[in-house]
């Protein structure tokens, strides 16, 4: 009889702690947790991003804050894998590249760049909140603006500011998760 009680108690504790872990995990999926725990994915898997998820991710960019509500951004979503690999050579089939562009040269139009940067971060974080890997690229932007603008069919006068890669990922790899941050004491000053 004592063994049955122990077994029942152990089963109860396992169920209770499992439920508690699920509740904690769900609570840790809020916006602050996504921001604090984000990482730039380096290891992507093949697999498409469903249209409904992609729409949510793009809506996050569209809804980003904008100075004077100018909303200067334009989003070009690249699902064509041949074109995507011209921009990001290690792009994996099914990954999506989202090019964020604005009017101007992409270097001196400060207000537009800041607004587009907010849209880029919103897209990046929305993808991670939905369980996808995401990574922001600025390295390919000059080549993209110089060589691929016509192929991307950017609006007249627009230049790419940044792009976000979105795709499936298995888990956090050592390279992606290894980025340490400076301590608050090194980067923050409170003026009271």
Give the label of every model feature segment.
Residues 2-192:
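Acidic, surface-exposed loops and disordered segments
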């Amino acid at each position: 009889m004592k063994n049955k009680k122990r077994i029942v108690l152990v089963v109860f504790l396992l169920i209770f702690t499992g439920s508690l872990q699920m509740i904690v995990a769900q609570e840790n999926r809020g916006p602050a947790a996504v921001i604090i725990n984000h990482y730039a994915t380096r290891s992507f898997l093949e697999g498409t991003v469903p249209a409904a998820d992609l729409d949510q991710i793009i809506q996050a960019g569209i809804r980003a804050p904008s100075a004077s509500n100018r909303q200067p951004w334009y989003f070009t979503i690249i699902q064509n894998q041949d074109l995507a690999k011209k921009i990001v050579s290690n792009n994996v089939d099914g990954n999506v590249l989202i090019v964020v562009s604005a009017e101007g040269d992409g270097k001196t139009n400060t207000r537009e760049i800041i607004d587009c940067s907010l849209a880029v971060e919103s897209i990046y974080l929305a993808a991670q909140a939905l369980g996808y890997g995401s990574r922001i690229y600025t390295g390919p932007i000059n080549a993209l603006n110089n060589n691929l603008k016509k192929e991307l069919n950017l609006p007249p006068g627009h230049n790419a500011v940044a792009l976000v890669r979105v795709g499936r990922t298995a888990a956090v790899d050592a390279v992606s998760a290894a980025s340490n941050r400076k301590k608050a004491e090194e980067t923050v000053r409170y003026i009271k």
